[in-house]
Amino acid sequence: MFTKTLTTLSAALMGGVFAISAASACTTNTPCVVADGEYFVATPDGETPDSAVIFIHGFGGSGAGVFRNTGLTNSVLDRGYLLAAPSGLKMPDRNGGSWSFHPDRAQRRDEIAFITSVRDDLIAKHRIDPDKILLSGFSIGGSMTSYLACAAPDTFPAYAPIGGSFWRPHPTGCEGDVRLLHTHGWSDGTVPLEGRLLRGTDINDVGALAQGDVFHAMEIWRAANDCVHLKADRFDTSGPFWRRAWDRCLPGSALELALFPGGHVIPKGWAKMALDWFENL
């Protein structure tokens, strides 16, 4: 399903001295600057990874702030992955950044183009293999991940949103099949599985601001992957996550839902589960 030539990057990939020096200038505190934005990186000690997780922060966060979650950071680095965290645009009169994720609402930046430029920079300057990049995000970062996967599914080989999905009105369809693992807290009250009304008196009001329904999102993903049945094909409750997977779908696609007994958090053990899933695709 996922093929990527990225021939325009071949010259940059050959420029070893430039690539190494440019990459070394980027850290968890010093941003890498790309078109329309910036991102921060952490790399495993003493290693030159060829795999990466790009992690999109939630509402009011920042790329640098992602690394304050040491559990997430260490879990990714310990697996030998580079961790990259782009920054959303700062909000007027508010602290932190956010994302123009919903295609039907005002766009402060072409977020798909920006995140794609982060991908390209990682490939060119950090020698990351384009077939070994997992895009993930939490809360609104999970929503941004989902909308990118829906609109431009071939941008990344796989997607793993956490605690955030589509908003209302839901997409009517996606541009192609995906490999996607959605993780969500069973008792999430900030972004409930069924969604939440943030503005307006009814989710159907004109101008209402309402989160979407995760189960409806899974229906959209099943349609994108041309899955044979509504019902999942595999169930696994043996570990900390309650997992269900749809296997009888388009060749090369993958779809899984993982729930856990908790709220609006990145759950302990998520990185191991997600990277195990990614590496076994």
Describe the predicted segments one by one:
Residues 10-19:
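Bacterial N-terminal signal peptides
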Residues 186-233:
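Accessory cap/linker subdomain of secreted extracellular hydrolases
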Residues 1-11:
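Bacterial N-terminal signal peptides that target proteins for export
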Residues 88, 160-167, 185-189:
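Active-site nucleophile loop of the alpha/beta-hydrolase fold
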Residues 179-183, 211-212, 222-281:
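C-terminal catalytic histidine-bearing segment of alpha/beta-hydrolase fold enzymes
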Residues 29-134, 151, 194, 271, ...:
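Serine-hydrolase catalytic machinery in alpha/beta-hydrolase-like enzymes
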Residues 21-52, 65, 78, 107, ...:
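A domain-start/cap signature at the N-terminus of enzymes
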